[in-house]
């Protein structure tokens, strides 16, 4: 079953499968299924066409998913960088934005280690 251009895994419960769509988390998935009148523990393979259509309609009307959600997030980050605020500078330098320490750790954000040459030892005569 495809929703918002994403193939949902058929063997998973509906509430879990919906979280494979970017922009839909666990709480949103539960809310969507409740509005559609579908039990969260039903598998995607068990849903009929009317139920699938109801889910698609709810998502299309009330949620920003996939490309639209990603675009909004990128726009928000670009705005922070353009206005030159602290968070924008941290994004620009690829450093942690939320106040984490960077003397050690922060490897995910900073990338692979770049080795800096150490101090040369003095040669004894």
Curated annotation (Swiss-Prot):
Protein name, UniProt field: Small ribosomal subunit protein uS13
Gene Ontology terms: cellular component: cytosol; small ribosomal subunit
UniProt xrefs under HAMAP family: Ribosomal_uS13
Known role: Located at the top of the head of the 30S subunit, it contacts several helices of the 16S rRNA. In the 70S ribosome it contacts the 23S rRNA (bridge B1a) and protein L5 of the 50S subunit (bridge B1b), connecting the 2 subunits; these bridges are implicated in subunit movement. Contacts the tRNAs in the A and P-sites.
Quaternary structure, from the entry: Part of the 30S ribosomal subunit. Forms a loose heterodimer with protein S19. Forms two bridges to the 50S subunit in the 70S ribosome.
Ranges annotated as spanning the membrane: none
Family label: Belongs to the universal ribosomal protein uS13 family.
An example Gene Ontology biological process: translation
NCBIfam families membership: uS13_bact
Gene3D superfamilies per record: 1.10.8.50, 30s ribosomal protein s13, domain 2
Lineage: Bacteria, Pseudomonadati, Chlorobiota, Chlorobiia, Chlorobiales
């Amino acid at each position: 079953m495809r929703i918002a251009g994403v193939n949902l895994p058929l063997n998973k419960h509906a509430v879990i499968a919906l979280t494979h769509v970017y922009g839909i988390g666990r709480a949103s998935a539960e809310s969507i299924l409740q509005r559609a009148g579908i039990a969260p523990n039903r598998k995607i393979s068990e849903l009929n066409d009317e139920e699938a259509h109801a889910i698609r309609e709810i998502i299309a009307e009330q949620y920003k998913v996939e490309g639209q959600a990603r675009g909004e997030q990128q726009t928000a980050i670009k705005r922070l960088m353009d206005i030159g605020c602290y968070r924008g500078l941290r994004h620009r330098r690829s450093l942690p934005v939320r106040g984490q320490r960077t003397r050690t750790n922060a490897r995910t954000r900073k990338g692979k280690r770049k080795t800096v040459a150490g101090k040369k030892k003095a040669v004894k005569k």
